[in-house]
Amino acid sequence: YLFSYMKLFKRSKKEGSKKRPWRFIILGAIICYLFIAAINVGIEYTSSDEYCQSCHVHTESDAAWKLSTHYDNGSGVVVHCVDCHLPPKGEGYLWAKIKHGSKDAYGMMFKDTNKINWQAKSDPDIAIDFTYMNSCQKCHSNLFPSTLSDDGGDAHLHYHNNLATITCLNCHITVGHFDENNVHAHNT
């Protein structure tokens, strides 16, 4: 089968050498297209919630996510792992995907996950390393919707005036992963 394709590139006395470069260009374009398509399929496959959970070292993350308002809410919108834990596409998405995926794979293979202090990682100062504010803002661009309470409006105004020192996680740490010990219903 391969040899029949190789015949395409043999120089024929009738065809001359001028047509040969076009064959390489066409073949190169086809190979590039197939390579890019395969990469995109791989990116989509490894971006599913099921794939994240297949090697995520935090065993309780799936259950906590399914109890959160990012999974179970009145609007029916489900926010997926990559929506929060990776920056929006075009803003370092692939690099962050490689970095975090490598760390999770390493943790799964070489760390004792029972010794990891997951509660400490729920601190906003630490959680900021695993949650991207650009991702929050991609979905929540309007910080002052008409349904926001007065307290929520005051909190968002305070956030807006202190962007250098406050993140979404300071108030909304349990939005993505429910924690019954840290619930502020008016903040979700």
Describe the function of each predicted region.
Residues Y5-T188:
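Short sequence/structural segments immediately N-terminal
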